[in-house]
From Swiss-Prot:
PROSITE patterns: RIBOSOMAL_S7 (PS00052)
Keywords: Ribonucleoprotein, Ribosomal protein, RNA-binding, rRNA-binding, tRNA-binding
A biological-process GO annotation: translation
Subunit structure: Part of the 30S ribosomal subunit. Contacts proteins S9 and S11.
Role noted for this protein: One of the primary rRNA binding proteins, it binds directly to 16S rRNA where it nucleates assembly of the head domain of the 30S subunit. Is located at the subunit interface close to the decoding center, probably blocks exit of the E-site tRNA.
Protein name, entry field: Small ribosomal subunit protein uS7
InterPro entries membership: Ribosomal_uS7 (IPR000235), Ribosomal_uS7_bac/org-type (IPR005717), Ribosomal_uS7_CS (IPR020606), Ribosomal_uS7_dom (IPR023798), Ribosomal_uS7_dom_sf (IPR036823)
GO CC field: small ribosomal subunit
Pfam families: Ribosomal_S7
Organism per entry: Xylella fastidiosa (strain Temecula1 / ATCC 700964)
Lineage, uppermost ranks: Bacteria, Pseudomonadati, Pseudomonadota, Gammaproteobacteria, Lysobacterales
Family recorded in the similarity comment: Belongs to the universal ribosomal protein uS7 family.
Amino acid sequence: MSRKGSTPQRNVLPDPKYGSETIARFINMVMKSGKKSVAEKIVYGAMNVIGEKNSNAIELLQKALDNVSPAVEVKSRRVGGATYQVPVEVRASRRMALAMRWLIDSSRKRGENSMPRKLAAELLDASESRGGAIKKRDETHRMAEANKAFAHYRW
């Protein structure tokens, strides 16, 4: 572990089409193997699909992220010989990162024929509080609720 402390968080430039930092971060998380143009096509394609069904795609993305973002999660903490799953609150930056990651992962598992359609369908579902990403959030909250007794082991 580094002794110099944590590195400062780098700021992300807003995306060229919508001028939104959130969408720029989303594109970066969709990206695989440095292929940013492919990731942009996927995200902008999904936004276009959403735009056909819904008036404001950016608002819908924000609503989906808010719905999926977890309030608490569990972290492993070793006490004596036992390992406890201790519930801890999630800070805002990690909350957004987890929400984006879960949306992308669950959209990749969907059955639609192209990634932009999969992502659009998952975003629409998440904005209406259903879908794979919402299940993941609920599962995380359930784990935290089940291990509430170990909350005093927080650090």
